């Protein structure tokens, strides 16, 4: 018992009571069942079938408790009941064919069909452990219907989205047997438990009645109470629930069997073909939802009798035809129901639930009595039904069949049979109170009428029935379903089958009408017999009440006088044991009777085995009292024959043997008198325990079968401490084998707990052999004890041997029947066709998938979208490569910018150096080296730019190749697609041709096979005719031969007579001989005819059995057809549902397709944006190229400005040289003047001796300038530089320039020519000087330089400077060797550094790209420029 919802609501402090709660779960499993459900529900009608409102689910809800139903959000909900009772939150709902309870807060009502004020019915909700409310129910009219059972939901979420609606089948026709071993109890159908739902082909159907083939299937029913549907299954009581009732309450429930059948009219039996259809179709579809149902059904099917299956194969048509007959029996139901109380109704319903699903018949009636019933049809329909139920129910006694039947004893047997039949016939008479439920039993009895009486009576074991039962599946006279024409067009086949069955049904109806007319004549006699039986029942009830009162008084006396009665009971048991031994010896003498008893015991043993497999703990609590009561009754039956003739044992309400019903006959005789003529031995058979049991349960090897029961019985007999087990165990075999041994009453059993060991229940049964009670077993007496035990239990061993032999025989017969069955070929063919169908479905799916793929490609081709994904992928790859190239170019541009910055810094340094050189006039060589370094860097940058251009050209070429390759691949794929389409079309054509050819071959094969079968049938018919003719001829000749032989014997006799007495007339002798011969021939022929008559009778019986089997097969086929029609309707319903589902799926796919198209368009837009991005990248690359060109042009402009500065500096140097030459001439003139003055001075000095101080001379000298010469000498500049000289104030040279002349070394005088000039003359004004003399060869001659004075400082860079100088002199500054530059640098008109159009300061801070260069003139190449631009 699961407590999911109760545990969720449990308070934290209850965790300390876990042990107590576990005990409550074990002892009171039904108290917690309906914890989450309300005790009432508010409905619009008493059945809770009318839909109150329609709505949808607000949320998705999984099952949270027993009885609740799971659903998903927005699931359609039909409300069947609303809030009432203890729990106002739950509504009864129907979701997708599943019924259960749901929280009203989770339901959104959309449409209200019945207003709340119109909800007038409060229907109780009853759990499986609640007490049964018995209501005195009046007889209903024929129009009354049975209370339906709500569909129950399953506890899993798998069926929440089931879209298949349930089949519209009458709810009373659905019957499922469930194994009690699964859940220890049967839950309430309204609680949505699995036990009440039958899943047929994925559809859940409500169950009207569950007739369990168990001992515990108690089904109390009240037709007027709305709880009937819920109580029907829930009353299979879990006897773990203790009920505190006293002995008086127990006695109130002890009622005879004669009063039970009348209440059976309140609840219909299940429709048999529903079980058959379920059993046959349960495995056709493998749904995960009905795995639990299949398991439970399998457990019940294993225990189900084959006769039940055969009886279930009755048609609905016959039951409908016989329905008006049962309506006439309502009067007797009134009479019988007036004499019952509530407890009798309960037990009558318990009895019916057993009789509906009981195993094989265990009684055989008197031969002449049943022949009178069947041949003359004196008993009406209901009496025969009662006989069928008596044969198929365990609680009925076993009757012995005697072949020698006398007329007076036959009346006694009929009397006894009527005692057993009429109570059940009353049940059948009461069943017309409900319309549909009467059909199955009537149909079942109809089949019993058709059965020959010999097959019913002569068999004492059910073996023949078991052998013939499986033949119901053989098809009779129907066209083969698996022919090609029928398989391809099953509708025509079913139509043909329906027409044939309609014809057969019409013939059967005609026969049925005749038979009904004959049976209508017997109604009056039935009423008379029913009145007589009613009187008998009333007398039996009175005697039972008297006996119950006597028992109650006896129990009270036994409680007062316990010790005294124990001693009396011991003596009584000894006497009983002796009498049982005498009876056993007498039974051994009557071997036919013993064989019948053994067979009946074996059948009862089988039934006990089947019942013990299904019962878990339903009937084991009352075992001590039941055991004692049963033994007490049987003791009184054996010890007091006169009393037993009038008062038979009274059934206990709590006893599993309460089904033993005992009648009182007015023409009562002793038991010994009745044994000879159909003596009915009251054999106790198990029934279920009532809900008021109070004794604990002992599970007696339930679920382990007959072997475990036998082992348990043997252990009880030979155990050392038997008092704790045998008296309390549910040992059915012991009760069957020892019916005459009395039981100890409850008061005695309570006292036995304190009694000594030698008077306990075990030893009390064997006081005759008191020495074996507590005898210790040793090696010495082991053999003796075992021998005694074997003798004591000889009947048990005999039963075990008979059961084993019967089981082996049944298994062998079933195995032979299965091997000889004709279904193997059909099944193999069916499997082959299913495999081929599955393969065809798989091939069709594959072909359909290929076709859809091809169509998708074609549609994409038509929409010009084919290969767009590939294009996008290629474009993405191309975009990544372009982004990579862009990154490389950006890195190159960054390196170029860094180089430009370096060049700008170098220019700044050059400007500084130039300024310093110009100031000092000594940095020409360092300046030239710096200029050469910058030129070298410029050349490197040109190389890098050339490599970048080459890589760009390579990438462009690769892009063009990729585009060409893509176009070529697209064309090739289009051509391949066209080829594949053509091949596909050819394959389709070939497939259609092959299919047509295959159909033709199949048609030809079928026609040939039909012709061959027709020829074979014709030959067989011809041979049969010949055989018949030859047989007739042989019989005629054989008769003549026999006549001749008789005549010959007669003539021989006559001749012997003539030889003895010759007086007789010869003619008379001849005549007498002829007559005697004819007489002998006729006598022999009479013997042969008698043998033939016997053979024909046996053949007739066989043909009748075959006819019955054929009729059963016809009915089975009708049921199959009806089931197939239902399956067809179900399939159509499912087809509609699936069509709707696939339409919704198609709409969803269309929506998804539109989304995908939107995404595709988005991807197309992304592709377009990618192309645009690529175009932008290309434009950006072009922009970067233009920027690169602009930077290059700027560098060239800076070079040009540097050249202009160099030209300016050269001009200044030339002017300085001219000034130096002028100073040199002035110096030469001054030297010449000084020489002349020196000469004058010398002359004066040489002539100064004579003049020596002559003032005149001095004046003359002074007059000639002597004093001026002295002044000039004093004021003349010193050849050494003075501190104030500008040469000393010149700034320090740059570190990488050649050091100037040191001051201490002195500089060449400005009036001296440059060193190394070689006496060359200075150049003319405004011109460069001439090249120096070729003192160094041709190399020095070629490298004419304006600054050749410093050439010796840098000899390592002479070649580069020579190239630069050649460019300078040739006017090729900035000219590229490889045509790197496409534009000429910027030119200026003025090369003067003071020109305002060029700002030298811009090179220090301004790095913006210069304006784009002008286009290249058409007349000139891009790499040349005129000399005037320099």
Curated annotation (Swiss-Prot):
Residues 594-621, 1387-1402, 1420-1430 have a biased composition (Polar residues). Residues 818-1430 are cytoplasmic. Keywords: Coiled coil, ER-Golgi transport, Exocytosis, Golgi apparatus, Membrane, Phosphoprotein, Protein transport, SH3 domain, Signal, Transmembrane, Transmembrane helix, Transport. The gene is Tango1. Disruption phenotype: RNAi-mediated knockdown results in basal membrane proteins such as vkg, LanB1 and Trol accumulating in the basal ER. InterPro entries: cTAGE_MIA/OTOR (IPR051500), SH3_domain (IPR001452). Residues 50-112 form the SH3 domain. It comes from Drosophila melanogaster (Fruit fly). Residues 640-651, 1105-1114 have a biased composition (Low complexity). Required for protein secretion. May participate in cargo loading by binding to COPII coat subunits and guiding SH3-bound proteins into a growing carrier. At basal transitional ER sites in follicle epithelial cells, mediates the exit of basal membrane protein such as vkg, LanB1 and Trol, from the endoplasmic reticulum (ER) to basal Golgi clusters. Residues 1321-1334, 1408-1417 have a biased composition (Pro residues). Residues 494-620, 869-1245 form a coiled coil. GO terms for cellular component: endomembrane system; endoplasmic reticulum exit site; endoplasmic reticulum membrane; Golgi apparatus; Golgi cis cisterna; Golgi membrane. The modification Phosphoserine is found at residues 865, 868, 1345, 1348, 1390, 1392. Disulfide bonds: none annotated. It is found in: Golgi apparatus membrane; Golgi apparatus, trans-Golgi network. GO terms for biological process: endoplasmic reticulum to Golgi vesicle-mediated transport; exocytosis; Golgi organization; positive regulation of secretion; protein secretion; secretory granule organization; vesicle cargo loading. Residues 284-296, 1348-1361 have a biased composition (Acidic residues). Residues 1364-1380 have a biased composition (Basic residues). This is Transport and Golgi organization protein 1. Belongs to the MIA/OTOR family. Tango1 subfamily. Residues 35-796 are extracellular.
């Amino acid at each position: 018992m699961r407590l999911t919802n109760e545990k969720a609501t449990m308070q934290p402090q209850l965790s300390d009571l876990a042990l107590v709660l576990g005990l409550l779960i074990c002892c009171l499993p039904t108290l917690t069942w309906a914890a989450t459900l309300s005790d009432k529900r508010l409905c619009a009608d008493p059945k809770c079938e009318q839909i109150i409102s329609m709505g949808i689910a607000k949320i998705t809800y999984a099952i949270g408790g027993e009885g609740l139903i799971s659903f998903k959000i927005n699931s359609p909900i039909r409300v069947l009941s609303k809030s009432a009772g203890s729990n106002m939150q739950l509504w009864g709902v129907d979701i997708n064919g599943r019924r259960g309870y749901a929280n009203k807060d989770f339901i959104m009502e959309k449409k209200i069909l019945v207003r709340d004020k119109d909800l007038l019915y409060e229907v109780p909700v009853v759990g499986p452990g609640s007490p049964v409310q018995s209501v005195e129910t009046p007889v209903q009219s024929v129009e009354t219907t049975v209370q339906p059972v709500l569909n129950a939901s399953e506890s899993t979420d798998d069926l929440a989205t089931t879209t298949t609606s349930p089949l519209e089948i009458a709810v009373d026709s659905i019957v499922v047997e469930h194994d009690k071993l699964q859940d220890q109890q049967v839950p309430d159908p309204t609680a949505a438990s699995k036990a009440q739902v039958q899943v047929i082909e994925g559809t859940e159907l409500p169950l009207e009645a569950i007739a369990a083939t168990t001992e515990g299937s108690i089904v109390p029913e009240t037709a007027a109470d709305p709880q009937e549907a819920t109580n029907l299954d829930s009353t299979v009581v879990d006897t773990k629930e203790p009920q505190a009732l006293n002995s008086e309450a127990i006695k109130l429930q002890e009622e005879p069997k004669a009063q039970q059948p009348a209440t059976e009219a309140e609840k219909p039996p299940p429709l048999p073909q529903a079980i058959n259809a379920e059993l046959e179709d349960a495995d056709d579809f493998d749904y995960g939802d009905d795995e639990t149902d299949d398991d439970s059904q399998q457990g019940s099917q294993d225990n189900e009798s084959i006769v039940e299956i055969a009886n279930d194969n009755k048609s609905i048509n016959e039951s409908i035809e016989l329905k008006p007959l049962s309506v006439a029996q309502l009067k007797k139901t009134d009479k019988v129901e007036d004499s019952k109380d509530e407890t009798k109704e309960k037990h009558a319903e318990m009895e019916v639930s057993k009789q509906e699903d009981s195993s094989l018949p265990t009684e055989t009636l008197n031969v002449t009595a049943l022949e009178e019933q069947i041949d003359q049809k004196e008993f009406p329909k209901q009496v025969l039904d009662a006989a069928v139920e008596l044969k198929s129910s365990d609680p009925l006694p076993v009757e012995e069949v005697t072949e020698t039947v006398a007329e007076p004893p036959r009346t006694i047997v009929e009397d006894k049979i009527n005692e057993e039949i009429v109570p059940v016939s009353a049940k059948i008479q009461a069943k017309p109170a409900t319309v549909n439920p009467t059909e199955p039993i009537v149909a079942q009895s109809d089949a019993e009428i058709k059965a020959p009486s010999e097959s019913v009576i002569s068999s004492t074991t059910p073996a023949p029935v078991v052998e013939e039962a499986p033949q119901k599946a053989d098809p009779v006279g129907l066209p083969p379903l698996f022919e090609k024409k029928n398989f391809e067009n099953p509708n025509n086949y079913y139509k043909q089958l329906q027409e044939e069955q309609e014809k057969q049904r019409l013939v059967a109806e005609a026969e049925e009408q005749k038979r009904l007319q004959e049976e209508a004549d017997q109604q009056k006699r039935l009423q008379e017999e029913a009145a007589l039986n009613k009187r008998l029942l009333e007398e039996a009830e009175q005697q039972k009440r008297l006996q119950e009162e006597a028992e109650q008084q006896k129990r009270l006396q036994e409680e007062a006088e316990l010790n005294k009665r124990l001693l009396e009971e011991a003596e009584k048991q000894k006497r009983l044991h002796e009498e049982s031994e005498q009876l056993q010896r007498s039974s051994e003498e009557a071997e036919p009777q013993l064989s019948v008893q053994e067979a009946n015991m074996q059948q009862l043993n089988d039934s006990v085995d089947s019942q013990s497999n299904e019962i878990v703990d339903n009937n084991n609590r009352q075992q001590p009292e039941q055991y004692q009561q049963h033994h007490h009754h049987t003791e009184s039956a054996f010890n007091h024959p006169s009393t037993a003739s009038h008062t038979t044992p009274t059934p206990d309400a709590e006893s599993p043997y309460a089904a033993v019903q005992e009648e009182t006959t007015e023409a009562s005789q002793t038991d010994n008198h009745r044994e000879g003529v159909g003596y009915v031995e009251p054999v106790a058979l198990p029934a279920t325990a009532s809900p008021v049991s109070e004794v604990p349960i002992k599970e007696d090897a339930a679920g382990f079968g007959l072997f475990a029961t036998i082992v348990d019985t043997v252990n009880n007999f030979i155990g050392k401490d038997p008092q704790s087990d045998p008296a309390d165990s549910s040992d059915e075999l012991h009760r069957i084998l020892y019916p005459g041994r009395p039981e100890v009453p409850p008061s005695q059993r309570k006292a036995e707990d304190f009694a000594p060991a030698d008077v306990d229940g075990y030893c009390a049964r064997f006081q005759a052999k008191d020495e074996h009670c507590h005898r210790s077993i040793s090696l010495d007496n082991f053999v003796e004890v075992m021998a005694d035990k074997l003798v004591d239990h000889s009947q048990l061993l005999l039963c075990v041997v008979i059961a084993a032999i019967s089981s082996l025989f049944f298994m062998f017969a079933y195995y032979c029947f299965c091997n000889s069955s004709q279904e193997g070929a059909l099944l193999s063919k069916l499997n082959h066709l299913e495999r081929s169908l599955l393969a065809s479905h798989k091939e069709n799916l594959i072909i359909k998938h290929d076709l859809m793929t091809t169509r998708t490609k074609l549609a994409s081709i038509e929409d010009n979208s084919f290969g767009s994904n590939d294009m996008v992928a290629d474009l993405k790859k191309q975009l990544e490569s372009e982004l990579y190239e862009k990154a490389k170019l950006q890195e190159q541009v960054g390196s170029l910018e860094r180089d430009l910055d370096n060049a700008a810094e170098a220019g700044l340094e050059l400007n500084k150096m130039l300024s310093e050189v110009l100031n000092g006039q000594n940095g020409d060589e360092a300046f030239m080296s710096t200029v050469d370094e910058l030129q070298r860097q410029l050349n490197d940058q040109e190389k890098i730019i050339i490599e970048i251009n080459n890589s760009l050209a390579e990438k462009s070429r690769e892009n063009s190749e990729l585009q060409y390759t893509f176009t070529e691949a697209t064309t090739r794929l289009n051509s391949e697609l066209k080829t594949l389409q053509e091949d596909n079309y050819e394959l389709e054509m070939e497939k259609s041709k092959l299919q047509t050819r295959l159909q033709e071959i199949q048609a030809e094969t079928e026609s040939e096979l039909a012709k061959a079968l027709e020829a074979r049938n014709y030959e067989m018919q011809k041979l049969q005719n010949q055989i018949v003719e030859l047989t007739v001829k042989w019989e005629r000749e054989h008769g003549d031969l026999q006549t001749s032989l008789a005549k010959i014997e007669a003539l021989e006799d006559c001749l012997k007579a003539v030889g003895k007495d010759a007086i007789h007339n010869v003619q008379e002798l001849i005549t007498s001989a002829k007559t005697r011969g004819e007489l002998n021939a006729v006598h022999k022929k009479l013997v042969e005819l008698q043998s033939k008559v016997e053979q024909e009778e046996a053949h007739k019986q066989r043909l009748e059995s075959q006819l019955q089997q054929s009729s059963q097969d016809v009915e089975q086929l009708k049921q199959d057809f009806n089931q197939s029609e239902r399956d067809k309707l179900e399939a159509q319903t499912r087809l509609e549902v699936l069509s709707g589902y696939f339409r919704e799926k198609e709409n969803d796919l269309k929506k998804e397709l539109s989304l995908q198209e939107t995404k595709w368009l988005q991807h197309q837009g992304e592709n377009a944006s990618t192309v645009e991005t690529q175009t932008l990248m290309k434009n950006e690359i072009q922009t970067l190229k233009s920027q690169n060109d602009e930077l290059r042009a700027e560098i060239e402009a800076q070079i040009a400005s540097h050249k202009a500065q160099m030209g300016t500096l050269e001009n200044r140097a030339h002017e300085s040289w001219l000034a130096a030459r002028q100073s040199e001439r002035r110096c030469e003139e001054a030297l010449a003047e000084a020489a002349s003055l020196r000469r004058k001075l010398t002359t004066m000095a040489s002539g100064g001796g004579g003049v020596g101080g002559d003032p005149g001379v001095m004046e003359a000298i002074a007059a000639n300038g002597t004093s001026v010469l002295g002044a000039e000498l004093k004021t003349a500049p010193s050849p050494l530089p003075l501190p104030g000289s500008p040469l000393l104030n010149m700034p320090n040279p740059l570190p990488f320039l050649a050091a100037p002349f040191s001051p201490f070394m002195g500089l060449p005088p400005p009036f001296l020519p440059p060193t190394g000039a070689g006496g060359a003359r200075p150049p003319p004004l405004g011109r460069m000087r001439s090249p120096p003399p070729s003192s160094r060869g041709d190399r020095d001659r070629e490298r004419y330089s304006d600054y050749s004075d410093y050439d010796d400082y840098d000899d390592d860079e002479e070649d580069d400077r020579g190239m630069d100088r050649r460019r300078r002199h040739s006017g090729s500054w900035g000219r590229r060797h490889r045509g790197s530059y496409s534009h000429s640098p910027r030119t200026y008109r003025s090369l003067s550094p003071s020109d305002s159009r060029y700002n030298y300061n811009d090179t220090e801070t301004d790095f913006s790209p210069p304006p784009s260069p002008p286009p290249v003139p058409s007349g000139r190449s891009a790499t040349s420029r005129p000399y005037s631009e320099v």
